[in-house]
Amino acid sequence: MPAPKLTEKFASSKSTQKTTNYSSIEAKSVKTSADQAYIYQEPSATKKILYSIATWLLYNIFHCFFREIRGRGSFKVPQQGPVIFVAAPHANQFVDPVILMGEVKKSVNRRVSFLIAESSLKQPPIGFLASFFMAIGVVRPQDNLKPAEGTIRVDPTDYKRVIGHDTHFLTDCMPKGLIGLPKSMGFGEIQSIESDTSLTLRKEFKMAKPEIKTALLTGTTYKYAAKVDQSCVYHRVFEHLAHNNCIGIFPEGGSHDRTNLLPLKAGVAIMALGCMDKHPDVNVKIVPCGMNYFHPHKFRSRAVVEFGDPIEIPKELVAKYHNPETNRDAVKELLDTISKGLQSVTVTCSDYETLMVVQTIRRLYMTQFSTKLPLPLIVEMNRRMVKGYEFYRNDPKIADLTKDIMAYNAALRHYNLPDHLVEEAKVNFAKNLGLVFFRSIGLCILFSLAMPGIIMFSPVFILAKRISQEKARTALSKSTVKIKANDVIATWKILIGMGFAPLLYIFWSVLITYYLRHKPWNKIYVFSGSYISCVIVTYSALIVGDIGMDGFKSLRPLVLSLTSPKGLQKLQKDRRNLAERIIEVVNNFGSELFPDFDSAALREEFDVIDEEEEDRKTSELNRRKMLRKQKIKRQEKDSSSPIISQRDNHDAYEHHNQDSDGVSLVNSDNSLSNIPLFSSTFHRKSESSLASTSVAPSSSSEFEVENEILEEKNGLASKIAQAVLNKRIGENTAREEEEEEEEEEEEEEEEEEGKEGDA
């Protein structure tokens, strides 16, 4: 959805003729007639409900097209007050605003009204859907271009100067109007008109395509459109924001499929400053939004919407905008701030080759992590690596690394193998042959399950592909900034699916109802049940198809390991070497460019794979297993002895270790204060009968009498010794319990690691 091209309006005719880089800036004061023509009205409850229903419905439909839609930084979105959502890059024509509206609605429950071109509103499906979202229509001058009399060409020495033949520039054209070329090859804004056959443009035509340059140098027909007064649009936006509502805008002006951002239009800055200038008590905040896609035009791809930090507009900047002499500087300053905010939430590259190299660097850098990184973190990693690559690309290490990465990518294309499947293929002929066989059987089963849904929905697939490709060719012929016009493909695929899927379900339901016409069933129930069944079958085919495609992609490296094992081994070796070099380079240069980059913390958080660390863990686990086995044997040995009570254990312990008690106490406490002077050498009389059957048969009456006498004399010492012994046994028991708990935890970790390895 494009942003309006805004024109500046000054009070005097003299100021109207000034030339500036921001000729699209409108004056801070809006026409009084426009103010009176539009009066803001709060949307009715019905409109709000329809907005919520339409957003929820389309957002879930888009979830069928995209495999995953994620939001990041939604907590930064203000929950109150006027907000302008500035989104870029505009890579999906009518998909972008719906995804953004859905994320905002889901996170902070706020409604966003997008600015949309009036020409788009005239398209039946787009205009119908836009009516539910309270969109604001904008008339663009280029949409009003009409053929004019005569032909034009540019001066070879000055491309801004246009020379006319049989033209009437003085009567047919006006300053700040548009001169357009045929076949949508571009347009330019008139700066001044010297005569009927000569005028000067503010900026020269874009001559990126050879046919455009040839036409302008040899002569061509042209179109003209008068300047459009956008004061009504301004006033409507100002009032919308003044009532604490949200506006959405794509400041690039139109959708495109380039890898970098287009120059931002000044309209978004004027909207924010103009609203705060007209309503001093209003505080407008601007939230940059990054629309990040992985293959935006492909079915079942992924999308990430990232919200940046809100941009606060200082009162000093509003005062600067209020002054006619400095208002352009204020707009430029705010526009630069918005541009920096967008760059912080988007991934942009200078060319496609750079993007491919950076994505390979990111993928190979991630090989050190044993856990899967979240999608928003991958986007942030892409963004930082793009910035780092652009900054250090002339470094000899980076240049050599780039050369090797491009060679590796060429090898991947040669084998038609994606990078993430290279390491999965192991050169084991018998095992891989079995895997290919069993996975092929599984794929056949999945294919048979998905086949009914595929057959039922195939007309929509075919129609959507053909129409979207035709729309892409049309859009490419009318644009000077698109590369392949992939930005319109997803939009038309979704629109065709939304329009024809219900019709197709009705068609199949009618056939089923007709087939079952002889059954004594209610026809309405049969039709309704058939319709619901068609929806369930096709959606199930979608889910099963995802699983099947993942399995089908995994067959390629297995087949390659059977047919070209040496080539696969070399590819795996090159990948490992590249990964080691990339990890070293990123860790070295990353901390220099980004102070908050901490590779150690990243490694710790995502459980980095380290061979030395794994060996250490394995050794520790083996040691604990050995201790556990020894403990089990000791327990079995103890259980076979005739000791049947804890007290007997204590007595046996005293009987066998009485000589070492004192030494152990000295060694442990390094003190003599708690060592008993008299140890309990013999058993108590009350225990003698039990001890005689469990420890030793020799216990004469003399010894028993002597034991009683000693116990009477040395009862205190005996109690102290017994207390110390109990304490030691308790400590040993607690220590053993702790070791058992640690061993159990280690066993659980081993089981989890084994399951992850199997997965």
Curated annotation (Swiss-Prot):
<feature type="region of interest" description="Disordered">
    <location>
        <begin position="613"/>
        <end position="667"/>
    </location>
</feature>
<dbReference type="GO" id="GO:0016024">
    <property type="term" value="P:CDP-diacylglycerol biosynthetic process"/>
</dbReference>
<comment type="pathway">
    <text>Phospholipid metabolism; CDP-diacylglycerol biosynthesis; CDP-diacylglycerol from sn-glycerol 3-phosphate: step 1/3.</text>
</comment>
<feature type="short sequence motif" description="HXXXXD motif">
    <location>
        <begin position="414"/>
        <end position="419"/>
    </location>
</feature>
<feature type="topological domain" description="Lumenal">
    <location>
        <position position="450"/>
    </location>
</feature>
<keyword id="KW-0012">Acyltransferase</keyword>
<feature type="topological domain" description="Lumenal">
    <location>
        <begin position="1"/>
        <end position="48"/>
    </location>
</feature>
<dbReference type="GO" id="GO:0005783">
    <property type="term" value="C:endoplasmic reticulum"/>
</dbReference>
<keyword id="KW-0808">Transferase</keyword>
<comment type="similarity">
    <text>Belongs to the GPAT/DAPAT family.</text>
</comment>
<feature type="transmembrane region" description="Helical">
    <location>
        <begin position="435"/>
        <end position="449"/>
    </location>
</feature>
<feature type="topological domain" description="Cytoplasmic">
    <location>
        <begin position="466"/>
        <end position="493"/>
    </location>
</feature>
<feature type="region of interest" description="Disordered">
    <location>
        <begin position="729"/>
        <end position="759"/>
    </location>
</feature>
<feature type="transmembrane region" description="Helical">
    <location>
        <begin position="49"/>
        <end position="69"/>
    </location>
</feature>
<feature type="transmembrane region" description="Helical">
    <location>
        <begin position="494"/>
        <end position="514"/>
    </location>
</feature>
<feature type="topological domain" description="Cytoplasmic">
    <location>
        <begin position="545"/>
        <end position="759"/>
    </location>
</feature>
<protein>
    <recommendedName>
        <fullName>Glycerol-3-phosphate O-acyltransferase 1</fullName>
        <ecNumber>2.3.1.15</ecNumber>
        <ecNumber>2.3.1.42</ecNumber>
    </recommendedName>
</protein>
<keyword id="KW-0444">Lipid biosynthesis</keyword>
<dbReference type="InterPro" id="IPR052744">
    <property type="entry name" value="GPAT/DAPAT"/>
</dbReference>
<dbReference type="GO" id="GO:0016287">
    <property type="term" value="F:glycerone-phosphate O-acyltransferase activity"/>
</dbReference>
<feature type="region of interest" description="Disordered">
    <location>
        <begin position="684"/>
        <end position="705"/>
    </location>
</feature>
<keyword id="KW-1208">Phospholipid metabolism</keyword>
<keyword id="KW-0256">Endoplasmic reticulum</keyword>
<feature type="compositionally biased region" description="Basic and acidic residues">
    <location>
        <begin position="647"/>
        <end position="659"/>
    </location>
</feature>
<keyword id="KW-1133">Transmembrane helix</keyword>
<keyword id="KW-0594">Phospholipid biosynthesis</keyword>
<feature type="transmembrane region" description="Helical">
    <location>
        <begin position="451"/>
        <end position="465"/>
    </location>
</feature>
<dbReference type="GO" id="GO:0005789">
    <property type="term" value="C:endoplasmic reticulum membrane"/>
</dbReference>
<dbReference type="InterPro" id="IPR002123">
    <property type="entry name" value="Plipid/glycerol_acylTrfase"/>
</dbReference>
<comment type="function">
    <text>Dual substrate-specific glycerol-3-phosphate/dihydroxyacetone phosphate sn-1 acyltransferase, catalyzing the first and committed reaction in the de novo synthesis of glycerophospholipids and triacylglycerols (TAGs). Prefers Gly-3-P over dihydroxyacetone phosphate and has a marked preference for 16-carbon fatty acyl chains. Transfers a fatty acid from fatty acyl-CoA to the sn-1 position of glycerol-3-phosphate to produce lysophosphatidic acid (LysoPA).</text>
</comment>
<dbReference type="GO" id="GO:0008654">
    <property type="term" value="P:phospholipid biosynthetic process"/>
</dbReference>
<keyword id="KW-0812">Transmembrane</keyword>
<feature type="compositionally biased region" description="Acidic residues">
    <location>
        <begin position="736"/>
        <end position="759"/>
    </location>
</feature>
<feature type="compositionally biased region" description="Low complexity">
    <location>
        <begin position="688"/>
        <end position="702"/>
    </location>
</feature>
<keyword id="KW-0472">Membrane</keyword>
<feature type="transmembrane region" description="Helical">
    <location>
        <begin position="524"/>
        <end position="544"/>
    </location>
</feature>
<feature type="topological domain" description="Cytoplasmic">
    <location>
        <begin position="70"/>
        <end position="434"/>
    </location>
</feature>
<keyword id="KW-0443">Lipid metabolism</keyword>
<dbReference type="GO" id="GO:0004366">
    <property type="term" value="F:glycerol-3-phosphate O-acyltransferase activity"/>
</dbReference>
<dbReference type="Pfam" id="PF01553">
    <property type="entry name" value="Acyltransferase"/>
</dbReference>
<feature type="topological domain" description="Lumenal">
    <location>
        <begin position="515"/>
        <end position="523"/>
    </location>
</feature>
